[in-house]
């Protein structure tokens, strides 16, 4: 059982004007829900209304905010990353740069920009420690996205030194949870597996085909824990240094598949398609710094998080053929 650690401070958030870019997305929805429960005045920035690649749109988005939480991003799984490297690099880099500059010009008091574990070098020793972040190039399929997100740390440090602008860019582990993207074209591993296993169980399919060998390892952070970490970062993180946010627990992809199979109740065969890429060989985080600087520790076990996610996704299929 994971320990219960720090919770966001309602007195900090009460009536505070907070802008959340990507606030209608997967992680943003959880962040906005927590902020509203804490009494913040929340402005949700949607891509349909604000193209943050445009400096003018970014300026309008952050105007009047005391705190900005930047979550808007172009994201996808391994297949999407391999097909669309250019927009993953360009869109994420330009959106982040515009949000930093326009937040500074608008007099925002604190900017929290989500960074990603994909920023780490391909062959970083596990667990990933923040001091190893700059010791190599990311895994190739992740590099355009990972390096664009890594620039959030560069911008945070540069703006702090040049303008004394208070910002941080916590490095988030792989996220999962209800309301994730379950589209097989661009979903991440847990959402893709859940969709495949639930569909196979529902339709009586004898096997589920999964990408790769199943041998790589990953770390998975439940979305509600990630949302809490970002609010704690806004309150407590007074540095532009990288800070890992995760569970600090490693899970083999093959074991993840077995867990999801069991929870779904699928009794067929799992087939591993080794002609498909595995991605990075191993990935999980040393989370000591987050515990020390933010008082953060994840509280949702992988089994419980998977159960909630599966139940949520399955409920969307009720009545469908």
Task: Report each predicted region and the residues it spans.
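Conserved beta-loop-beta element that borders a ligand/cofactor-binding pocket
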Residues: 115-116, 153-178, 191-194, 202-209
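Flexible, glycine-rich beta-alpha linker
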Residues: 51, 119-121, 168-190, 216-217
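C-terminal substrate-binding subdomain of Rossmann-fold SDR/epimerase-dehydratase oxidoreductases
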Residues: 11, 26, 32-40, 199-321
